[in-house]
Amino acid sequence: MGNAVSVIGLGAMGAALARAQLSAGHRTFVWNRSKPKVETLVAEGAVAAQTGAAAAKAADVVLVCVDTNTTAEAALEDVWRDGALAGRVVVQLGTTTPAEARSFAAKVRAAGGKALDGAIMCYPDRVGPENSAPVMVGGDVEGFEVARPFLKQISGNLIDLGDNIAAAAALDLGLLATSISLYAGVAHAARLCEAEGADITLLAKLCQHGPRAPERFEIIAKDAFALNSLYDGGSLAVWADVAEHVKDQAQSAGINSGLPEFLSDFYRRAVDAGHGTEDVAALVKILRG
């Protein structure tokens, strides 16, 4: 099974991971709760697994990319019961908190496998060996070397974080924490300028820092909130989930969670107001009242 890999979860990122493996000539097993997504990949050359457990048993390297850690653990429920992961490397590539990374890794190791936790720092359409965006991976050192040929198909910028299974989640959440705070700041700054009749597009030109802040200003200035209508990016609902992860990590680590609690509530209010499918810049609509 040295040239085989399994991909569990075929959302936008999971499907991109599977296609990258297929492009590299790897025998690729796939599983997803929604069968049409499996059928699409099978038509492209993948092999369907009937269950998540079957996918985990089909290859020595297993890439897990689902929406939550709870979903990931549920997908492999039968494997946890029969301890069938001996000789396998399981790489958790969904968004997790450090505590969740440790929990998932403990289950993998108890079932006889080697555990890695990773963070992919790009959108699905950039996945591939020519991608320069970082992919950070930590955990079992021997497992990393086994998984390396498959991980290199995700990005040419593979960062080995050593044996710290929680490092990728911590770094990922650290970057995401700056992002969710900045997007809230953009909305506030835009509303401030609106109230005073100042030019938001000029503010965008003046702003040279932060993750894509100028684009969010322009979206607000042009009321172009439909997702990807002006610039690509994550939906407000996706960023609301990010805020929840950052809040959970602060509480888990016992650090002051006042700011992430506020931000999580702020983002969730925007989702509850019906803006979840719009660009994250739609946060300004909550401030507009």
Please annotate each region the language model reported.
Residues A16, A54, V61, D67, ...:
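Amphipathic alpha-helical hairpins
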Residues A167-L287:
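Helical "substrate-binding/catalytic lid" subdomain
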Residues T95-T96, E100-A177:
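Rossmann-fold dinucleotide-binding core
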Residues T28, A48, A115-L116, L158, ...:
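Hydrophobic beta-strand scaffold residues
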Residues M1-V64, R88-V89, P124, A195:
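NAD(P)+-binding Rossmann beta1-loop-alpha1 motif at the extreme N-terminus of oxidoreductases
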Residues G52-K114:
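Rossmann-fold NAD(P) dinucleotide-binding segment
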